Swiss-Prot record:
Its EC number is 6.1.1.15. This is Proline--tRNA ligase. The keyword Cytoplasm applies. GO terms for cellular component: cytosol. It comes from Parasynechococcus marenigrum (strain WH8102). It catalyses: tRNA(Pro) + L-proline + ATP = L-prolyl-tRNA(Pro) + AMP + diphosphate. Its main location: cytoplasm. CDD domains: ProRS-INS, ProRS_anticodon_short, ProRS_core_prok. Catalyzes the attachment of proline to tRNA(Pro) in a two-step reaction: proline is first activated by ATP to form Pro-AMP and then transferred to the acceptor end of tRNA(Pro). As ProRS can inadvertently accommodate and process non-cognate amino acids such as alanine and cysteine, to avoid such errors it has two additional distinct editing activities against alanine. One activity is designated as 'pretransfer' editing and involves the tRNA(Pro)-independent hydrolysis of activated Ala-AMP. Homodimer. Keywords: Aminoacyl-tRNA synthetase, ATP-binding, Cytoplasm, Ligase, Nucleotide-binding, Protein biosynthesis. It is found in: Cytoplasm.
Length: 593
């Protein structure tokens, strides 16, 4: 391809909309163009990158025994209502675009395909003899993100590879899950990415075991915690650790203290000379449940710990035996709208009585009470007294009628000891999620009543797995992990072109003739090569070559008459002057070993 025919439009200035380096470089390099909020056009070079990534994915999925298919993007609402996810995905802050057809039937634009594929499996896979089956597709997905940002990292339209496997039993599911784990590791390695597999929460997809693949990068939205012995890694949403120990309070009688204006942990500790880890703080939240209930939640937590919102939502879901659409802090304005005026924020204790909710106009009138283990393990502690400007000192759970059941609701933090090895410590890194694999179990097959006949002649729901890769996100993650001050440094396996031939001076016949010769030779050898034949200054061409990040640059310059060229490797900027035939040989050795 000649650059003069490529529709290459590069930008010198950083677009104001682009917050992170990879987004800036993809816009500046002419790879993508913004069409609307969270909506991007993939321009010719970007499309080549995406095709190269997709080719690697297809090869590894096929190697793993998966079958490629293509599923509809329009989903009848009935399927999602049967699985119980329609309201969660369309109401409030739900992420599914939905519409009505001219007959008034509700449809959703697919953000994921569990319902559709499970329904099809139930119709087509009737016997255990047909199992296991693993189906995958590469397709555009749609999600109505509340805050689209970072270019392709969090868009409203994106390309994804999603796969779904069906099994007769859990052991077979686990075997395929292990095969897919290895396939994913090979995919990311072949794409030239350092991707860390981490334990993860299953989120709205649901299921039992789940693992994310994170590309480590400073701009990553996810915080991952990795043990310094290399044996454990988890997304902070899922991570567990041993919290730092705190000094126990010396035994003493319960005391009621006046604490005017001391509504924060910091304020209390300063005024009373207390340690944060010796307090039990109480958080009030409101959970919106799938059946429409608005459930007040009271959470007790040790004063030096932070609440993990994902663990909280999972705990509420387990206790209520249904999905949670939203869970947010209760504010004084919320209380006023409910007609409740009796809750003293800043002075709440773990034993706040349910009667304070008696006048609530639309909330459930009793608290769902949860407590983190760090709080329940304290023998004595300081806490609120449920009265304005008052706290209790040297309180025990016995004073409050007994300790609630403790569970892990806290955020694990860097520097804390590891559960698997107390001698190891957690370290913190930022990551970009590029892949996620799940053991779904029977969640969807049971909800949709999709069964096969087992070897005993009885109907049984499928065991299912789900495996996703964000294809367009992976491309941008590669840029985030591989760039320098000059621009992108594409890994060779996914670069839009393997070599760029730059003619420094198009007015020099020796340079243009040699450039055409080298270009033709590389094409004949099967190299995907770009020829910069523009009538631009050499400096402009060199800057553009650095910006778009082609792995190898072959410069035809002032030594063209002698047949000498410059061979430059983009990853390390190493330059060698070589006879053009030798330079071509070096390229073939590197690219076609």
């Amino acid at each position: 391809m000649r650059v003069s025919r490529l529709m290459l439009v590069t930008l010198r200035d950083v677009p104001a909309e682009a917050e992170i380096t990879s987004h800036q470089l993809l816009l500046r390099g002419g790879f993508i163009r913004r069409v609307g909020s969270g909506i991007y056009a993939y321009l010719p070079m970007m499309w080549k990158v995406l095709q190269r990534i997709t080719t690697i994915i297809r090869e590894e999925m096929n190697r793993a025994g998966a079958l490629e298919t293509l599923l509809p993007q329009l989903h009848p609402s009935e399927l999602w209502q049967r699985s119980g996810r329609w309201q969660g995905y369309t109401a409030g802050e739900g992420i599914m675009f939905h519409l009505e057809d001219r007959q008034g039937r509700e449809l959703g634009l697919g953000p994921t395909h569990e319902e559709v594929i499970t329904s099809l499996a139930g119709e087509l896979l009737r016997s255990y003899r047909q199992l296991p089956v693993n189906l995958y597709q590469v397709q555009t997905k749609f999600r109505d993100e509340i805050r689209p940002r970072f270019g392709l990292m969090r868009g409203r339209e994106f390309i994804m590879k999603d796969a779904y496997s069906f099994h007769a039993d859990e052991a077979d599911l686990q075997a395929t899950y292990a095969v897919m784990d290895q396939a994913y590791r090979r995919i990311f390695e072949r794409c030239g990415l350092e991707a860390v597999p981490v334990d993860a929460d299953s989120g709205a997809i649901g299921g039992a075991a789940s693992q994310e693949f994170m590309v480590t990068a400073e701009a990553g939205e996810d915080l991952i915690l990795i043990s310094d012995d290399g044996a454990y890694a988890a997304n902070q949403e899922k991570a567990v650790s041993i919290p730092d120990a705190v000094a126990s309070l010396p035994p003493a009688a319960l005391t009621l203290l006046k604490t005017p204006g001391q509504t924060t942990i910091e304020g209390l500790c300063t005024a009373q000379a207390w340690q944060p880890g010796q307090l039990v703080k109480v958080l009030l939240l409101l959970a919106q449940l799938e059946d429409g209930q608005q459930q007040p939640v009271l959470v007790s937590l040790r004063g030096d710990q932070d609440l993990n919102e994902v663990k909280l939502v999972n705990a509420v879901s387990r206790r209520s035996e249904q999905g949670v659409l939203d869970c947010r802090p209760i504010s004084p304005d919320d209380l006023q709208r409910q007609g409740i005026n009796t809750i003293p924020f800043g002075f709440i204790g773990p034993d706040l009585a349910d009667k304070v909710l008696a006048d609530a106009s639309s909330w459930t009138t009793s608290f769902l009470r949860l407590a983190d283990t760090t709080a329940t393990e304290l023998e004595q502690f300081h806490c609120g007294a449920n009265a304005e400007d008052q706290h209790r000192s040297h309180c025990s759970w016995g004073d409050l009628g007994g300790a609630p059941q403790g569970e892990d609701l806290r955020k694990a933090r860097a520097g804390e000891r590891c559960v698997h090895n107390p001698d190891a410590r957690l370290q913190e890194k930022r990551g970009i999620e590029v892949g996620h694999i799940f053991q779904l179990g029977r969640k969807y097959s049971q909800a949709l009543d999709c069964c096969f006949t087992n070897e005993n002649g009885r109907d049984e729901p499928f065991w299912m797995g789900c495996y996703g890769i964000g294809v367009s996100r992976l491309a941008q993650a590669a840029v985030e992990q591989h760039h320098d001050d000059g621009g992108i440094r594409w890994p060779a396996a996914i670069a839009p072109y393997e070599v760029i031939v730059v003619i420094a001076n198009n007015h020099d016949d020796a340079q243009t003739d040699l450039g055409d010769t080298v270009y033709a030779t590389l094409l004949e050898a099967g190299i995907d090569v770009l020829l910069d034949d523009r009538k631009e200054r050499a400096g402009v061409k060199f800057k553009d070559a650095d910006l778009i990040g082609i792995p190898w640059r072959l410069v035809i310059g002032r030594d063209a008459a002698e047949g000498t060229v410059e061979l430059v490797q983009r990853s390390n900027r190493e330059m060698r002057k070589l006879p053009h035939g030798e330079a071509i040989g070096e390229l073939l050795k590197a690219l076609r070993p």
